[in-house]
Amino acid sequence: MPKFNPKQMKDLERMLGLKTEQLNAVKVTIELQDKILVIDNPVVVKMLAQGQEVFSVMGSAREESKQQQKVEIKEEDVKFIMEQTGKSEKEAREALEKSNGDIAKAILALTEGENK
């Protein structure tokens, strides 16, 4: 890969009409249909070219299966579901975990049997 010095890069950007900005990203997550790619401590550059935002991400990626992604359950979500359904904290939390944190799905799962 050819090396460019910063001045050459700026000249090239100006010539091509690119505007770039380096972002202070901590982690980049790319969700695919069957897995998740996670890049910790990436170098992320945002470019604006012809009215389009383009992101360049550089770093080492690791793969995670979708099942490995643990959803963070917020206490406020648990309380909200308890209020809406009249269910216990344990039931509300389990429904949230099964629905991957989707509040609407959790409420539907807890109330479906009651509406039949």
Swiss-Prot record:
Keywords: Protein transport, RNA-binding, Transport. Pfam families: NAC, UBA_HYPK. Residues 6-70 form the NAC-A/B domain. GO terms for molecular function: RNA binding. Homodimer. Interacts with the ribosome. Binds ribosomal RNA. GO terms for biological process: protein transport. Gene3D superfamilies: DNA helicase RuvA subunit, C-terminal domain (1.10.8.10), Nascent polypeptide-associated complex domain (2.20.70.30). This is Nascent polypeptide-associated complex protein. SMART domains: NAC (SM01407). Belongs to the NAC-alpha family. Contacts the emerging nascent chain on the ribosome. InterPro entries: NAC-like_UBA, NAC_A/B_dom_sf, NAC_arc, Nas_poly-pep-assoc_cplx_dom, UBA-like_sf.
